[in-house]
Amino acid sequence: MTFSHRPVMPAEVLEYLSPRPGGVYVDGTLGGAGHARLILEATSPDGMLIGFDRDPAALEVARERLALFGERFRPVPGNFSEMGRVLAELGVDGVDGFLLDVGVSSHQLDTAERGFSFLTDAPLDMRMNTLVPGTAADLVNDLNEHELARIIKEYGEERWARRIASFIVKARVDGPIERTLQLVDIIKGAIPRGAWEERIHPATRTFQALRIAVNDELGSLERGLESALGLLRPGGRGVVISFHSLEDRIVKTMFRRYAQGCTCPKELPRCVCGGVPRLRILTGRPVVAGDVEVAENPRARSAKLRAAEKL
């Protein structure tokens, strides 16, 4: 299977994750297994990597590409949000590090029939796990106008959300919206031509919103990150790469909450909550890809890396 995927910020991931031989690590989003290979190489000869992916195609590719590492690699079909349960079933009670490279993969975008791209005609699908029900077409055709507008506004940060939702509801009266380019045409008609942005396709934000909703991406990130931080051993590190502000905000907020410690009101003379910091944040500001990497891999342009260490 042809599966093109170039790992984002590979050197930075290794720097902040700091994998070592004998350690137990989790890659919550295997994708093309680029990061996973680097972690397995860095933890040779006896480190273990548990890798998650809910995309059956990605998991198959990861198994093939990482077969040479034998039992040091444990592939898991499913969402990294289920990390706590899965690791307990594997008898793993703690990890030395984890990586979450969230969002849609290059392969998913480039595979037209998956329906993630607004540039090619395909079924309006957008499921990362094609074995479960619930496609983007289901949302577009079944949700009421208010709920559609909410999703597009909240997950896509689209200023024209209400107008787009209205146009979608009117268009589906003539028949179901089942193709990506059908939806693109509706979105283009909803956004006034003078409001189109020079470097951003008019459908970008709506497609992002539907993809996030179909795959519960933000909920998965919150649950998975909470679970991963709970499993992290003292001195262990967590690295998260996100690709838009909604994801980055979740990571930043959770890292800060774990690093805060005391949550007592400032007016109290002493701490009564007993809270202590559980994390040390390693990245005051998110790390971004360098110019050379962005030139070679445009997907890296919007990537933001945050890292923290368990206390």
Swiss-Prot record:
Keywords: Cytoplasm, Methyltransferase, rRNA processing, S-adenosyl-L-methionine, Transferase. S-adenosyl-L-methionine binds at residues 33-35, 53, 80, 101, 108. GO terms for molecular function: rRNA (cytosine-N4-)-methyltransferase activity. It is an enzyme of class 2 (transferase). GO terms for cellular component: cytoplasm. GO terms for biological process: rRNA base methylation. Its EC number is 2.1.1.199. It holds the Pfam family Methyltransf_5. It catalyses: cytidine(1402) in 16S rRNA + S-adenosyl-L-methionine = N(4)-methylcytidine(1402) in 16S rRNA + S-adenosyl-L-homocysteine + H(+). It is found in: Cytoplasm. It comes from the Bacteria. Specifically methylates the N4 position of cytidine in position 1402 (C1402) of 16S rRNA. HAMAP family: 16SrRNA_methyltr_H. This is Ribosomal RNA small subunit methyltransferase H.
